[in-house]
């Protein structure tokens, strides 16, 4: 899932939470908070994957430099 899709899910959750609170519908508010948490977790996993990929690319790059020498 892309950063954009995660942000859309988070914003949807905020909207759902706000509507739930405005209408005193606690179930809807809880669903909104859950949607936000889910989006935050997906974003954290995506960010961690990006960092791992960056580190792996750096390691592979250093091996390639060693092979050239």
Curated annotation (Swiss-Prot):
Q: Which organism is it from?
A: Corynebacterium diphtheriae (strain ATCC 700971 / NCTC 13129 / Biotype gravis)
What's one Pfam family here? CsbD
Q: Which domain of life is it from?
A: Bacteria
What residue spans carry the region label Disordered? 1-42
Looking up InterPro entries in the UniProt record yields: CsbD, YjbJ_sf
The protein depicted here goes by the name UPF0337 protein DIP1660
The protein's matches in Gene3D superfamilies, at most eight in alphabetical order, are given as: YjbJ
| Compositionally skewed regions (Basic and acidic residues) per UniProt | 1-19, 30-41
Family statement drawn from the similarity comment of this UniProt entry: Belongs to the UPF0337 (CsbD) family.
